[in-house]
């Protein structure tokens, strides 16, 4: 399963949101990959998520494969939609 997800928090994927992405991804057995600007990373690796350096308004491709892929996608979509708690 693959979807595009937009970064809507003003500061982009800095340390705190990256940690939240990794924590969310780690709750699932499925393989979760995020792609941005010709980089594809493992969403369960904090260093990899930080290296994406995805800014505000970036469109990320999220690909999830596994038995709990629907639940994982729903959780990640909700996390990104919340702006990681940084929206004013």
Where are these regions (language model features)?
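Absolute protein N-terminus
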Residues: 1-3
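Compact, glycine-rich, soluble single-domain proteins
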Residues: 6-47, 51-57, 64, 79
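C-terminal structural segments of small proteins and small subunits
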Residues: 53-88
């Amino acid at each position: 399963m693959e979807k595009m997800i937009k970064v809507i928090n003003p500061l982009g994927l800095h340390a705190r949101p990256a940690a939240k992405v990794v924590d969310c991804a780690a709750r699932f057995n499925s393989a979760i990959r995020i792609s941005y600007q010709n980089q594809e990373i493992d969403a369960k690796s904090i260093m990899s998520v930080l290296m994406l350096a995805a800014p505000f308004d970036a469109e990320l491709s999220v690909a999830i494969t596994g038995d709990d892929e629907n639940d994982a996608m729903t959780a990640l979509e909700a996390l990104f939609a919340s702006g990681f708690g940084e929206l004013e």
